[in-house]
Each structure stands twice: as C-alpha cells, then as structure tokens.
Regions:
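Short, low-complexity, intrinsically disordered N-terminal segments
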Residues: 16-18, 36-37
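Short beta-strand elements that form the blades of beta-propeller/WD-repeat-like
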Residues: 20-28, 33-34, 57-66, 70-71, ...
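Beta-strand-rich domains and repeat architectures in extracellular enzymes and scaffolds
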Residues: 20-25, 42-53
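Sec-dependent N-terminal signal peptides
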Residues: 3-16
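Residue-level detector of conserved, function-critical positions
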Residues: 46-63, 81-101, 117-124
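Surface-exposed loop/turn elements that mediate protein-protein interactions on large endomembrane-trafficking
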Residues: 32-48, 71-84, 109-122
C-alpha cells in the first residue's frame, strides 16, 4: 500500500510540473499577444485589449499594466496577482523569478507572486 501511495504521489508531482508551461517568447501584434513555450510551440493568444500593456515576462509568468493596475499572469493569461500602480511605481525589469520597480527614489524587488522581497534607495 505504501508503494502504491508513493508511486501515485510521484505521478501527481510529475503531472503538476508538466502542466506548468514555460514562456520562451511573447510575440506582440497590433491586437494580440501570442505566447510561445521553450519548444517554439504556441501556448495561446491573448487580446491586447483584455491584457493591457505588456511590461515583461519571466519563465512562467508575465506582467501587464491595465488601467491603474499591474497584473501578474501565468502562461495562459490567468491573473495570479493584481497590484496597484500607485503602490508599485513603474516596472523597470522582469526576470525569470522577480519583478523590479521604481517609485520615487526607491527601487523595489517583488517575487513572481507579488510579494515585496527587497527595497533600497536609488543611486540617482
């Protein structure tokens, strides 16, 4: 019974990892964003009007600004976290696991879940 449970748990873990799609590239057209994986396969298309302005992407998420909010979304466009622009400032960079923003004389680093992980003063 213990072996069956272990095998089942392993299969569920592998399935969850396979479902998490990696973003390799986001193509921007006049009306659409097309998201591609590391194999060059199209994951999906998202309308620009529903997503907003693309600010950048990491390995399995992207950040878009729509109205007064930044939306952190997964590869399929599902919103994972919404953050108010007035709290975050201007997004200046997105890496595979983090987001960097600047607000006034402060630089903030956020994880891909939208949690602030660092704050420092700017050198400018």
């Amino acid at each position: 019974m213990k072996k069956i449970f272990t095998i089942l748990l392993l299969l569920l873990t592998l399935n969850a990892q396979a479902q998490r799609q990696q973003i390799s590239y986001i193509e921007e057209t006049k009306y659409w964003y097309y998201v591609y994986d590391e194999q060059g396969k199209k994951i999906g298309g998202l309308s620009r009007s529903s997503v907003g302005e693309l600010k950048g992407w990491g390995c399995d998420f992207f950040v878009a600004k729509r109205y007064s909010y930044y939306h952190i979304c997964d590869a399929k466009g599902k919103t994972l976290k919404t953050m108010n622009v007035s709290d975050v400032g201007e997004i200046v960079g997105v890496t595979s696991t983090a987001i960097t923003s600047k607000k006034g004389s402060w630089i903030f680093t956020w994880n891909k879940e939208g949690k602030k992980i660092n704050a420092r003063t700017s050198n400018q």
